[in-house]
């Protein structure tokens, strides 16, 4: 099997992006794991696949696979790279691109300054839709993990997120507690674990342990989920700069009933071809 791909990243959250409109490729979980290997393969956090639209009202279908081979519902940084890829490869010349995902639809907008704004839809807090085991929706839940009780928020941005406010995110043991939260029994489909330090009502620092990938340089949907939880807990304003290890994202959310918007960069690194 021979195919072309692009390597891209959004603030260091890196992707292998493949056009499956003009190429016929089947990505098995084993193949994805081999390609994701940073020593023996291409190396990436997620594989992004461009497919023909499933819905006539959309331009493309957007599929996301983690480095462990599992398919997931959403990836915000990947969505920005997806938008840049389809324009760069001449698959569309639109500046407003509609895509379907495993769990919904998104609008991707290419801005004049070359940043990409993603309409992430409305954050979902109903426990059964996240999914999260709870009798009713709360702003804060108590999670017992190992030797700690975490005071956390839970939200879906098309994929599940658990957000915990901490005093010093740089010193926090994200690897230890990220793994424990990711596989916590109250999240039946596992969860992305975000740890957020509030600098001001309009600025936070965030580290995210991604489900199936570990800690990444940036997580777009994680930044969106963190801000949504912070706003619901009355800790943040409507516009927030989120500083991640890989760089900054700008998040805007006017509250329940409104869509959330994420703006940030998408970088093309190189193009390649593989024979498998």
UniProtKB/Swiss-Prot annotation:
The keyword Isomerase applies. Substrate binds at residues 13, 46, 66, 76-77, 159, 192, 210-211, 220-221. Its EC number is 5.1.1.7. It comes from the Bacteria. InterPro entries: DAP_epimerase_AS, DAP_epimerase_DapF. NCBIfam families: DapF. Belongs to the diaminopimelate epimerase family. This is Diaminopimelate epimerase. It comes from Aliivibrio fischeri (strain ATCC 700601 / ES114). The gene is dapF.
């Amino acid at each position: 099997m021979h195919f072309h791909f692009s390597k891209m990243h959004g603030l260091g959250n890196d992707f292998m992006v493949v056009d499956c409109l003009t190429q016929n490729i089947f990505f098995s979980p084993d193949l994805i794991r081999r390609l994701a290997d940073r020593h023996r393969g291409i190396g990436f956090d997620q594989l992004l696949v461009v497919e023909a639209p499933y819905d006539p009202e959309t331009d493309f279908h957007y599929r996301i696979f983690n480095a462990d081979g599992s398919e997931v519902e959403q990836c915000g940084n990947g969505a920005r790279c997806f938008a840049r890829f389809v324009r760069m490869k001449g698959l569309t010349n639109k500046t407003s691109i509609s895509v379907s995902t495993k769990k919904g639809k998104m609008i991707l907008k290419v801005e004049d300054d070359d940043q990409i704004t993603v309409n992430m839809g409305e954050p979902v807090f109903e426990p059964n839709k996240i999914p999260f085991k709870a009798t009713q929706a709360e702003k804060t839940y108590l999670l017992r993990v190992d030797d700690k009780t975490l005071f956390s928020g839970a939200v879906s941005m098309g994929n599940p997120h658990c957000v915990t406010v901490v005093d010093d995110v740089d010193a926090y043991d994200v690897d230890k507690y990220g793994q424990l939260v990711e596989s916590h029994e109250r999240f039946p489909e596992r969860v992305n674990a975000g740890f957020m330090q509030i600098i001001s009502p309009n600025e936070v620092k965030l580290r995210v342990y991604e489900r199936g990938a570990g800690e990444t340089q940036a997580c777009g949907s994680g930044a969106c989920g963190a801000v949504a939880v912070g706003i619901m807990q009355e800790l943040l304003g409507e516009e927030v700069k989120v500083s991640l290890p890989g760089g900054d994202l700008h998040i805007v959310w006017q509250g329940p009933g409104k869509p959330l918007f994420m703006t940030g960069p998408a970088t093309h690194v190189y193009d390649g071809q593989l024979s498998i």
